[in-house]
Structure formats: C-alpha cells, structure tokens
Amino acid sequence: MEAFPVIDMEKLNGEERAPTMEKIKDACENWGFFELVNHGISHELMDTVERLTKEHYNKCMEQRFKEMVATKGLEAVQSEINDLDWESTFFLRHLPVSNISEIPDLEQDHRKAMKEFAEKLEKLAEQLLDLLCENVGLEKGYLKKAFYGSKGPTFGTKVSNYPPCPRPELIKGLRAHTDAGGIILLFQDNKVSGLQLLKDGEWIDVPPMKHSIVINIGDQLEVITNGKYKSVMHRVIAQPDGNRMSIASFYNPGSDAVMYPAPALVDKEEDQQKQVYPKFVFEDYMKLYAGLKFQAKEPRFEAMKAMENAVNLGPIATI
C-alpha cells in the first residue's frame, strides 16, 4: 500500500521544490487528499484553537448532543442508520462577511482565536491554489479569479466533535460524500482517528498527525481542471472511545461564480476529452448538492449538464 501523501511545505523553498511539487500533483490526481506540515501556521495558535474548541464542546454542546441521542433512541439501535451522522457541529462564516461575532455561547477568546486561525487558513488556501495552478499549467491566480464571483469567494468553517459511539458499526460519524466546493483545509484531532478516503475501491485511514493540516480537493476543482484533479469520497468512522475534534474550513467559489473547465486545459485535450464537465453557477450546484450530498458526484455533474443544455436550447431573448 502506498504511503498517504505528506507534504513538507518548507521544501518548496529550496532544492527539493521540483519533487515536492510533483508529490502535490500526484496527490491531487490520484488521492484527492494530502497532509501538510511546516505550513506556516503557528503551533501555539493551533493548540489554542484546539483547547478552546474542546472546552466549548464540553461546556455548551455535549449535553445537547446527549439529549439528541436520547430523543432519537440512538443508543439502543439494532440496525444500520443511514439518515443521520454521529456528530455535533456548528458553523462559522468568514467570507464574504464574517458572522463570528453572532455565534451564541462562544467565549471572546475563542472568537478571537478562530478569527485569527481563519485568516491564516485563507492565505494558505490561496497559496495552495497557486501551487495547483502551477502544477496543472494555469497562470498564477487563475483559480482564485475563477472562484471570485461578484463578491469574492465564500469561506467558512464547520466545527465538529465526534463523541464516543456505542454502536459504531451501525452509525457513521459522517456518511461518505465528496465536498461540493473548492479546496478544504482540515485541522483534525491527532489522538482520535476516524477520517477515511476511498482509493481504488478501499477505505484508507487519513493518519492523524499533530499540527498538520489535511487538504482535500472539492468538486469545483475537478470541474475547473477538467478532471485532472479529483474530488474523492470520504467519511468519518465513529469510534467507541475518545472524542474526535474536526475543524474543516471550506474555501469555495462565490455563490454567483460561474464554474466551467479552464479553456487553457480543454484546448490541450484530445477531441473526445475536450470538455467533459458542464458550465453552471455555483449556487445552482449547491442547491442540487443539498439533496444529493451522500450520493455519487457523477449524477450531479450530469444533472448540471442537462440544465446547461436546456438553457442553450432555450429561446433567445430579444429586447
């Protein structure tokens, strides 16, 4: 079994830049995931974010989760549950407008730490997008511009805790899915594992590493690269012991950004491979995704292509 790709970002600044870029390229094409170390975000900040997030769960979220479990009778389930996940979550929005000040129950130091962490992640996401541009042969800044829309990209964070589960064989922490958006940056618990990705028909553990950031490719990067980079199915396995923390930040296109394969990449393709993916508004894709998240991505792309064809075949407006 190949080793899970771990990228040391410090190596991008010296003689090992070329093999490191090749490793990123291989990860994007064949894994859809890679793990970053020496990414420039201070360990002290990450430790603070982790401590405050776990304290917040214990103080404000744990009892609510236990009440939900009791209400739904989940501790006594005898058959597989396919319509919910064993997770406790809340969401933060950073771009286009932050809502961190509006989230109830967050201590002021937690708000401050999450805001600083999000700012660092935003810069890291944009740095990574330029590395992906370089690897695939697009001009620097292309992916950021493609995500822009009229108000810039959207950027938000899903803060999750996965408590100990009495029946992990019957309930997933998070059911298998691909991510709808652009590039995802995950700060995960380094003690309790659970994240897995699907590669060559097998579920592979994403290894928990202290102070690393796990990166994965969303559906929109697959579209823009015309399939060169792949979003892959992943899931979270609930665990009988330990509470797993997950802070996933999603750097996505703006809601009105128009997604389509980069012409520079399409032009290089053989005729039959010219444009495999449709052209659509990101918000329309998200509406479709909301109901089909836990299904394969290909029917979503086909549905968007059908919508595109319907628009193209429609009457021409005259004024």
From Swiss-Prot:
Q: What InterPro entries has UniProt attached to this entry?
A: DIOX_N (IPR026992), IPNS-like_FE2OG_OXY (IPR044861), IPNS-like_sf (IPR027443), Oxoglu/Fe-dep_dioxygenase_dom (IPR005123), Plant_2OG-oxidoreductases (IPR050295)
Please write the reaction equations for the catalytic activity of this protein: 1-aminocyclopropane-1-carboxylate + L-ascorbate + O2 = ethene + L-dehydroascorbate + hydrogen cyanide + CO2 + 2 H2O
Q: Please list the GO terms describing molecular function.
A: 1-aminocyclopropane-1-carboxylate oxidase activity; L-ascorbic acid binding; metal ion binding
Q: What is its EC number?
A: 1.14.17.4
Q: Name one GO biological process term.
A: ethylene biosynthetic process
Q: Which cofactor does it need?
A: Fe cation
Enumerate the UniProt keywords alphabetically: Ethylene biosynthesis, Fruit ripening, Iron, Metal-binding, Oxidoreductase, Vitamin C
Q: Which pathway does it take part in?
A: Alkene biosynthesis; ethylene biosynthesis via S-adenosyl-L-methionine; ethylene from S-adenosyl-L-methionine: step 2/2
Q: Which domain of life is it from?
A: Eukaryota
Q: Which family does it belong to?
A: Belongs to the iron/ascorbate-dependent oxidoreductase family.
Record's protein name: 1-aminocyclopropane-1-carboxylate oxidase
Where is the organism placed in the taxonomic lineage, from the top? Eukaryota, Viridiplantae, Streptophyta, Embryophyta, Tracheophyta
